[in-house]
Amino acid sequence: MFYTTEVNDHGLKYNPFKAIVAPRPIAWISTIDNEGRTNLAPYSFFNGMQDSPPIIGFGSGPSKVGIDEPKDSLSNIKATGNFCVSIVSEALKNQMNISSGHFPHSENEYEIAGLTQSKGVTVSAPFVTEAPVSLECKLHDIITLPGTSKWVIGLVTAVHIKDEFIINGKLDITKYRPIARLGYKDYATISQVYELDRPK
């Protein structure tokens, strides 16, 4: 099949784009506002951009379809200049899904999802205590994309890794089984890996 994205004339029941760009790691973004209220939400347009210095980025759309209003995560990052990213393991998939709901500013996603938060060391934002890996980030830039989304770029200033997932000097993702976003309502669990040597 062939279709143009300007018209989206694919003829399918659902737009296949998110299923094509998959699997995508999930950034569990934790922020805090100037009043000390925390926010937690998952974002699947997320990835590392470079490793020296470590830079990550994630895309944030409007809070609701048809409403051009930024999500709490983006508003808090603009206000404080920092945030944390926690990686979602298979064991935390249900809590992550709960935190994806639309809640009033006064409600705490950590409490709603039954999670605890740990205080950041280099940033004011907390991170998910139960997560296998968390990154503390300082805002580097926010880029306005075509349409209604923003691309948030963060400099990673500190890394938290639970010791039980470091095996023989390497982070073993098969031990904590991170989940990834696919298309539609689909997710995947990373449970099997293999190595390939680069050509010399």
Residue ranges and their predicted role:
Residues 1-200:
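Basic, polyanion-binding surface patches
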